[in-house]
Amino acid sequence: MVKSQDAIQAEIRRMRRIGCIHFVGIGGAGMCGIAEVLLNLGYEVSGSDLKASPVTARLESFGAKIFIGHRAENAASADVLVVSSAVNSSNPEVMTALERRIPVVPRAEMLAELMRYRHGIAVAGTHGKTTTTSLIASVFAAGGLDPTFVIGGRLNAAGTNAQLGSSRYLIAEADESDASFLHLQPMVAVVTNIDADHMDTYEGDFSRLKKTFVDFLHNLPFYGLAVLCVDDPVVREILPLVARPTITYGLGEDADIRAVDIRQAGMRTYFTVLRQERAPLEMSVNMPGVHNVLNALATIAIACDEGIDDTAIVQGLSGFQGVGRRFQVYGELQIEGGGVMLVDDYGHHPREVAAVLKAVRGGWPDRRLVMVYQPHRFTRTRDLYEDFVQILSDANVLLLMEVYPAGEEPIPGADSRSLCRSIRQRGQLDPIYVERGADIAPLLKPLLRPGDILLCQGAGDIGGLAPQLLRNPLFGGRPEAVAQRELP
């Protein structure tokens, strides 16, 4: 029997000694969704962030008390502080809470508390978490299960990255970047892949990262389910260590659920799903690339295990409207002689960038790819430097913005000027270094040709570039057409 909203709220209200929940950095992608769910559950929520944004405005419209800037008095009425890994103990709000002996909990611990009374489905992996979580939420909704979800990106169909549902299901991303996913105790866990990223958390020890994923899977109850992508060599390596029921997925013949006959036509990808003891399923997703086929397979594995019928699976996947900044097509820039397809993508690891480039080549093989890329973090650029040089060389035209620091100090030789020099030395193309974001539009104008695909790629403030270009008069735009997030 599906529990009513009141029944679920009554259970969650076992946090009965907690009145006001205060989020430090409430505008962050991982924080705002949890705050929104708690608001919808009837909690008093406040939060602070360094600057106002559409996210903080949305939360304020739901009743959250928002403070701009971090000050000790912001946490005066809090019964618990929720912090992300980016917030340290020197934050004045955290210092005040510690002095007053108010609990300070990581974001994942609050998510775990929400998951405690629900059937939790947690999606982990270095790449593909947001899209896979979104696909699962879409299929569960199509199956009439009305899940609660907390996602790291905006689900376009819902217009939000979090939603309180009326069923027992909670679908959420599980973040390995700070190992905080170990707080979660889901019923079902997905691991999409395991790659060398955020290695500072694991003291540069890849074996420690692998062990942490195994520990995460062992947070499942003995009757839980691990859904694992065996196309990934590291996931395949840890599979014998996982002492829980498993379903595997991938393209290889040994996967429990696999895809064959994959073909791409522009944005849409078609494939056939082969499942053990079930009829083949003809499927399509409105997303390009083999990596998204794998994300869909994880979704199908869980949906089948939960008893969702094939009609709902097909409907939820084929009608999926995408996630913000995951190969998001903004439309066309107008230049002399025709249009240029404008795409925005969040991927910032070499493997993610390579998957996007492969998707572009697969869906539009006869079109030039013009890429504006912003590296994210100096440490990532340093650690994966040669991979970036090789993969970025596959664009036809490349503009490189300076590294988005994300709080890090510059590292000599791990900056975009160095990347430009190294890419130029390979001889495939001559990249252009862009010192200021405001210079991008006039630099692009003479470079673009009708029919090009313009890809804005990265996780930093490049996220504001696509809407800025779309409304730029240089490309036939109107300044009022799209809300702009300014670039420096």
From Swiss-Prot:
ATP binds at G125, T126, H127, G128, K129, T130, T131. Pathway: Cell wall biogenesis; peptidoglycan biosynthesis. Belongs to the MurCDEF family. The lineage of its organism: Bacteria, Pseudomonadati, Pseudomonadota, Gammaproteobacteria, Pseudomonadales. This is UDP-N-acetylmuramate--L-alanine ligase. PANTHER family: UDP-N-ACETYLMURAMATE--L-ALANINE LIGASE, UDP-N-ACETYLMURAMATE--L-ALANINE LIGASE-RELATED. Pfam families: Mur_ligase, Mur_ligase_C, Mur_ligase_M. It is an enzyme of class 6 (ligase). Its main location: cytoplasm. It comes from Azotobacter vinelandii (strain DJ / ATCC BAA-1303). One of its GO terms (cellular component) is cytoplasm. It is found in: Cytoplasm. The keyword Cell wall biogenesis/degradation applies. One of its GO terms (biological process) is regulation of cell shape. One of its GO terms (molecular function) is UDP-N-acetylmuramate-L-alanine ligase activity. It catalyses: UDP-N-acetyl-alpha-D-muramate + L-alanine + ATP = UDP-N-acetyl-alpha-D-muramoyl-L-alanine + ADP + phosphate + H(+). Keywords: ATP-binding, Cell cycle, Cell division, Cell shape, Cell wall biogenesis/degradation, Cytoplasm, Ligase, Nucleotide-binding, Peptidoglycan synthesis. Its EC number is 6.3.2.8. Coiled coil: none annotated.
